[in-house]
Amino acid sequence: MSSVFADPRVKELLNLHRSPKLATEGKTPPSQVQDLVNKYSRLGSNVVSHPTRSSPEKTTDKPADSKPSIPPLKSESVMTRLTALSSNNTTQNVASLVTAIASHPATAALPKQEASQQPVIPTSVEKRAVTQPLSQQNMNKLMNAIDPQAAPLIEDQVAGKHTGTKPLLTLQQQQAISSLPTKSERESALNEIALNTAIQSAQHANMELSKAGITFPMWFFGVQNQSDLVSRSFISLAHIQQPMVMNDSLLQEHLLVSDCIAVLQGCMQTTYLQVSEQNKEYVVTIRKEVATELPATLVAMTQRVLVHAHARFQIVNTIYTHQVPEYGRIANAFSQALRCIIKEYDFYLADLSKKHYGKMQSSAERGSLSLQTLEVKTKQIHIILENVADLCSRLGVVRGCALLQQLETAVLQSSGLSVKEVFQYLLSESLKPLGRIMDRYINEAVIPDSDAADFFIRKSHSTELAEEQGKTTINTWMQMFKVDDAQVPLFLNNIKTHLCDIGRSTVLLKWKKKQYIDKGPNASGQELLLLSAEASGETTQGFRHGEETVASLVCGDGSTGDLELAHIRLYKQLIDINARVQTKVLDFFINPEYLDFRGHLQNIYAFYLVMAGDFLSCFVESAISELVLSRSVANILRIRSKFKMVIKTSSLANLPYNERMNVIVCPELFKHHLNSVLYPQTYVPDRATDSPDPKVLNLLGLQYDVTYPLNLVLTTPVMERLNLVFRHILRAKVSEIELQKAWTTLQRLRKLERVPHDKIEVYANALRSDKSPIIIFFGVAYKMLITMLDFIHSLQFQYVTILTECIAKFQDTLVNAKSLDDLVSGMSAFANGLIMSLGLVSNNVVNILDTLFNDCIVYSHHIVKTFCIISNEDDEFIRKIVTINEESREGKSGPRGVKGSERMTSLLKKREAIEMTRLIAIANSVYSLIVDNRGLIATLMTKFNKGVASYEQVIRNFDDR
């Protein structure tokens, strides 16, 4: 359904209300609005004109061309019944209210033409599509199926658009009506039968509601004869015969209420910044933000009143699931109670404004109003809706809808707001509290005449010293607007959020001015004003006059003298300025001339995500002698010195801000560190199996120097998650380096292939002559090593692919960011996405990889330590080889008669004999070890292969989720 404010008649009413007025005028004269209504009524629109609302400020006569007035509500018979109804301490009877309304002379005084001009209400769904309600015949069939005694069938016989509805009569009723002499008597009898049928249905609905324990408080009906919102006219008998409907071209009360609730139900979830009380930094939280399809008047009213309407949404969702067309009309069952609550909220806030400035005049003395009373009434509506929802779940959706529709029809008899009344009320009344809130805040801050920017700047002085010392105490903005909930209604949080956002932006721009602009050659001493062109960098078109500050708009002291229009301009000005300043703050973070956030991201990608592989390999190899030491004896200063040296000699030497990066020794092992970050409230570490003094390599991490205001984006939780990613990648890199050392060691032993079989003492008869001993004995060892290297390389390739995709996605988010909140939420989502994509949120993945990494390192150390010792050359072997080499170089003469070539050949044979003797000794030792450990290596291979298979299965299951 398109917005009701798109109608040209509504726009003309809106322009009339927003037109400039004289300073002496209080509100738009109702006669002008009524003239517009009558104008469109004469043009053929289906407009039901209602008399104007009585106002204590000005009395306006009804135009001459309007319809005759209908007898007022306060007739003796109706008032007696309503008074007795409101004073009754028992459960309120909806049928009694219907009877009182039906007996009022207004039901007979209304023209018959009105019955045919009932507008059609569009059903409001999520896409606002227009659907026609159920016909009266179908609804009566439903009610007949529910209870044939209480709801007899009434057929809706409609001959044309402008013909009335006639009930389907029984044979006895037809005979009785036919016996009447005149046509008027027969029509009166038909109307009486229809009224009795509706009353029986209402009594049946009330009986069902009473059985379910649903009661109505006295004020639900009694307050209606006190409220000046109640019109002097009543709805005709056709509203009882046929459900309340509405034409698309008409602006009626229940359509506005449905629009409000549709807006609230269509809420969008977004993120904003909130100060953490623990580390004094901004964290991302979730709030509900109303969509901006409709004007701010409807949005404000929705946020203010429907704070306890969860049960109503429960009913709506249940009905929508079963696709019942009555979806958008249940709101009317309690619309009158909502209007009463809204009105009393306005009186309560008007009383606050009157104490400060005396700008508002109360229309009537309504006794002492308190927030507690209003909250109690709202809670009563909430309880009623919960009970109705339970009733629908027990009786079924169709029957529950039928009962709710009858209850809605009964309650609507006591309302009758006209187009003008509802439109003026929603436009003029609902935005006033927004200005009064700022009025109260500024007044309580004892600066009633100052500009809001000065107000913010003065409040921020207490934070400057702490910021200079490296601390972030911007939570002053949240503390500044903490007001006792017992004195301020819940819906005031809306304006508080805008003010906190503007206050945060003011602090950031003041810091930018102090750090960059004031230190430049063109620095000026002009103070930064948030609500001026200097702060936003643009011309503020909304402030047409220099004296129209926030304080003057709150107080209504602008040039127009109209408090309502001043508050509308104020609310719009807050939103516009906040958007412009947020753009400037975002540029402050992204611009390379200032914070250069993209330059810091390059360091994060290169160091934390190890996008430059040569750096990490060089660092581990150069500092491995220190990294393998325990934490208690390692020298962290020497490790950091080697870290800085590797940066200068690697491809990262030209990165900006690389001096901010350094290595640290984390206090926890990786698995404890991971769980403490992901589950800080519930994780209890089990250190029974941990080493009391672990190696530095198992505790190594990174630390990036982040200062204010960069720490608003690179928060502590974000940097902790990035550090976890680095520690995990480091473990995989260390495993690869150790396996490569083992591979080099085994490659050196390939020269043992030259040793003949018969020279090996452990030579077995099972050896086949077509294979050398090195292939047979070393086959298992080589296969195990190759399997481990293949797994580590595949894992690293998978990580590079995942990290590249996450970086590309975050770069798109960075390009599309519109505010600092988008930047913060995007950075937080990026860090969480890295942890999620690598599978570190799964304990199974972490445990399996931890076991596989340990197996790789243990096997590598075993190969290196065992075979390097055996293959080392002893002193005797080295002395013999050196002697032979010296004889070859010096060319000493050999035996007499032997030529030079023969002498060299003799030396080479002698050298080969010495080397072969050494190789035979090494081969015997190596083969003995392999024969003894061949079973253990095969067992380790089986275990490792099972671990790899388990990891692949867990990853597949994790990706499927």
From Swiss-Prot:
Keywords: Cell projection, Cilium, Cytoplasm, Cytoskeleton, Flagellum, Microtubule. Residues 15-76 are annotated as: Disordered. Residues 55-65 have a biased composition (Basic and acidic residues). It is found in: Cytoplasm, Cytoskeleton, Flagellum axoneme; Cytoplasm, Cytoskeleton, Flagellum basal body; Cytoplasm, Cytoskeleton. Residues 43-54 have a biased composition (Polar residues). Its main location: cytoplasm. GO terms for molecular function: gamma-tubulin binding. Signal peptide: none annotated. Disruption phenotype: Knockdown of expression by morpholino results in increased number of cells arrested in cytokinesis, reduced volume of median bodies, increase of cells without furrows, and reduced length of the caudal flagella. Gene3D superfamilies: Gamma-tubulin complex, C-terminal domain. InterPro entries: GCP, GCP_C, GCP_C_sf, GCP_N. GO terms for biological process: cytoplasmic microtubule organization; meiotic cell cycle; microtubule nucleation; mitotic cell cycle; mitotic cleavage furrow formation; mitotic cytokinetic process; motile cilium assembly; spindle assembly. One of its GO terms (cellular component) is gamma-tubulin complex. Component of the gamma-tubulin small complex (gamma-TuSC) involved in microtubule (MT) nucleation for the formation of median bodies and in the biogenesis of flagella. Gamma-TuSC may be required for the correct positioning of EB1 within the trophozoites. Component of the gamma-tubulin small complex (gamma-TuSC) composed of tubulin gamma chain, gamma-tubulin complex protein 2 (GCP2) and gamma-tubulin complex protein 3 (GCP3). Interacts with tubulin gamma chain. This is Gamma-tubulin small complex component GCP2.
